[in-house]
Amino acid sequence: MKKAILGKKLGMTQIFNENGKVIPVTVIEAGPCTVIQKKTVEKDGYEAIQVAFGDIREKLRNKPVKGHFAKAGVSVKRHIKEFKLEDSNSLEIGQEIKADVFEAGERVDISGVSKGKGFQGTIRRWNAHRGPMSHGSKFHRAVGSMGASSDPSRTFKNKRMPGHMGNVNTTVLNLEVVKIIPEKNLILIKGGVPGPNKGLVQIRNTVKA
C-alpha cells in the first residue's frame, strides 16, 4: 500500500457540496501517528513500519512496551500497528504521519471492529425469512430445518444458526474522502464506516484503484 494511518471514529454528520447537495459523512480523527520502529528485510525478513496512535497514561503500559517506546524516543501510546508501505524508507523513527497524507477525492479502504449485537437469532443475524404470523401457524421466528434426520444424522458445519453477532473485524472498500481538515487532524469520509463512536479504524489506499 502507498499510504495508511490509524484514526478514531468520532461520529456522523452531513455537509453540503458546491452544488448544495447534502452528503452524509463520517468524521475520523486521523493521527497523528508516530513511527516507532522500521522493519527491514535484512533483520526481520520484510519491510514495514510500526506506528503508534492515541495518548495513554504511562502506568497503564507494562515494562516491555514502555521500553519499546523509550528505545524510539517516543511517549507511550495506546495503539500499535504495522503497515507495509511502498516508500517506508522515506519515513524515520519519531516522524509523524498526519491526516494530510490523504487528499479530498481519494478512495480509501477503512477497517474496524463492527458493533457488537450480542446473541441474535437467524432472522436478524442471517436475514432469514420468518414464518407466517397467523392462520394457525406454529412457526414464526424459529430456526427451521437444520438438515436431514437419519442420514447424515448430524448438523453440518457452517450451518447458519443463532449465535453471537457483530464485534468482528470488518473492512469497507472504496470509500470517498470528501474533505480534509489538517489543523484538526480530521478526515471526512462519505457514508458510514465500521465500529462505534470512539472506535479504532485503519485508513489505507483502496485495493480497487
From Swiss-Prot:
Record bears the keyword Transcription? no
Q: Which NCBIfam families does the record cross-reference, listed alphabetically?
A: L3_bact (TIGR03625)
Q: Which GO terms describe its biological process?
A: translation
Name recorded for this polypeptide:
Large ribosomal subunit protein uL3
Q: Name one GO molecular function term.
A: rRNA binding
**Highest taxon above the source species:** Bacteria
List cellular component terms (GO). Answer: cytosolic large ribosomal subunit
Q: Subunit comment for this entry?
A: Part of the 50S ribosomal subunit. Forms a cluster with proteins L14 and L19.
Give the protein's function: One of the primary rRNA binding proteins, it binds directly near the 3'-end of the 23S rRNA, where it nucleates assembly of the 50S subunit.
Question: Which terms are listed as keywords in the entry?
Answer: Ribonucleoprotein, Ribosomal protein, RNA-binding, rRNA-binding
- Please state which protein family the record places this protein in: Belongs to the universal ribosomal protein uL3 family.
